[in-house]
Amino acid sequence: MDPALLDDVIRRLLEVKNLKPGKNAQLSESEIKQLCAAAKEIFLQQPNLLELEAPIKICGDVHGQYSDLLRLFDYGGYPPQANYLFLGDYVDRGKQSLETICLLLAYKVKYPENFFLLRGNHECASVNRIYGFYDECKRRFSVKLWKTFTDCFNCLPVSALIDEKILCMHGGLSPELNKLEQILNLNRPTDVPDTGLLCDLLWSDPSNEATGWAINDRGVSFTFGPDKVSEFLEKHDLDLICRAHQVVEDGYEFFASRQLVTIFSAPNYCGEFDNAGAMMSVDDTLMCSFQILKPARKMMGGSTNNKSGFKSFRGW
């Protein structure tokens, strides 16, 4: 993709900050297709299990909440001021999935060694056909553009290992995951199957309800108990599993005696939850701290207070 065009696309996407909330960026279908093609090429050049180094900032689900994505960058620094890893679920539910995914892909293309995107369960045609992204593509551009995104999403990597100690994915562990090399060997491009390792990495959830593996209420994949987390970390000499996939009230939530953390980065998710969003910063000693994007509070008369900045403190 022409570097001058890429810079101009990023400029137009960031200009939205100065417009009325919810205003769309002015991009053409041709420009978005070029972005998808360039990003797809980079995804396939890089491994399915990314090997990354701290310092890095990690974000969970964003779900088309574009103004909140911009708030995350306002706080953490716009690329390349900081390195980023996003854990998937960029589209669906929120009103501006197109702006959200386009900015993330543009940063991936511009800073391929500093900016990383993993696949979430919503980066899959059978899911985002239903939960909003297909309709947004069709309404604003075309079904053909949605298919272009599907081809791009089918190439996304699914896991990242930070300094050989923090394993990241969208969903969670899998009963089929015995060696990390298995992730490297997953074929791409691929759709997300209904069962198996790739499905579990994108869909599974931790659960305090039971030990071991159990049926997941989502109707897909499994849940895993604290025992499975401890067992996995010990076997692979890891310190922490970092995942997203579930709304958590404070934007982050520990599990299994701080051996696993869930990060969710869409505050006031869908306008229905009063949850905070969070971003986890990992410094070069692997100390983790959390920046909290507080939910907007309803004010008297039904207006909203959006002056909900961040707070930061040490964790884990």
UniProtKB/Swiss-Prot annotation:
Top-level EC class: hydrolase
Keywords from the named record: Hydrolase, Manganese, Metal-binding, Protein phosphatase
Chain sites annotated for binding Mn(2+) 1: D61, H63, D89
GO CC annotations on file: cytoplasm; nucleus
Transmembrane segments: none
Obligatory cofactor(s): Mn(2+)
Enzyme nomenclature, EC number: 3.1.3.16
Entries under SMART domains matching the protein: PP2Ac
Residues reported to bind Mn(2+) 2: D89, N121, H170, H245
Location of the active site: H122
Catalysis performed (reactions): O-phospho-L-seryl-[protein] + H2O = L-seryl-[protein] + phosphate; O-phospho-L-threonyl-[protein] + H2O = L-threonyl-[protein] + phosphate
Cofactor binding notes: Binds 2 manganese ions per subunit.
Record-level Gene Ontology MF annotations: metal ion binding; protein serine/threonine phosphatase activity
Family membership: Belongs to the PPP phosphatase family. PP-1 subfamily.
PANTHER family, sorted: SERINE/THREONINE PROTEIN PHOSPHATASE, SERINE_THREONINE-PROTEIN PHOSPHATASE PP1
Protein name listed in UniProt: Serine/threonine-protein phosphatase PP1
Organism, scientific name: Zea mays
